[in-house]
Amino acid sequence: MISKPDKNKLRLKRHRRIRGKISGTAERPRLSIFRSNKNIYAQLIDDVAGVTLASASTLDENVSDATKLEQAAAVGKAIAEAAKAKNISTVVFDRSGYLYHGRIQALADAARENGLDF
């Protein structure tokens, strides 16, 4: 029998490796992303204090009739606006082991267009 690698286990392995190298502070928090089949979530995290500074997700937004890519872009815009409200302009991007493609890229591009630097 041919064994297929478990994609989520490989993603979690990449995520642990990435998290060993990056960390967020109050001045430059970590923009962490989680993607499920149905929704996408983004958080600004201060790892020094262990606090979530702001968050946004497709559950917050009224984007039920939009495509998943459009939903991700709306979340990117919302997290950038939440960061502006807290006077945060630069972040450390944590893609959580996901490939920088599709919904992850759409969220990142929308956040950049709305004023976040990373």
Swiss-Prot record:
The keyword Ribosomal protein applies. PANTHER family: 39S RIBOSOMAL PROTEIN L18, MITOCHONDRIAL, LARGE RIBOSOMAL SUBUNIT PROTEIN UL18M. This is one of the proteins that bind and probably mediate the attachment of the 5S RNA into the large ribosomal subunit, where it forms part of the central protuberance. One of its GO terms (biological process) is translation. GO terms for molecular function: 5S rRNA binding; structural constituent of ribosome. Part of the 50S ribosomal subunit; part of the 5S rRNA/L5/L18/L25 subcomplex. Contacts the 5S and 23S rRNAs. CDD domains: Ribosomal_L18_L5e. It holds the Pfam family Ribosomal_L18p. GO terms for cellular component: cytosolic large ribosomal subunit. Disulfide bonds: none annotated. Belongs to the universal ribosomal protein uL18 family. It comes from Lactobacillus acidophilus (strain ATCC 700396 / NCK56 / N2 / NCFM). This is Large ribosomal subunit protein uL18. Keywords: Ribonucleoprotein, Ribosomal protein, RNA-binding, rRNA-binding. HAMAP family: Ribosomal_uL18_B.
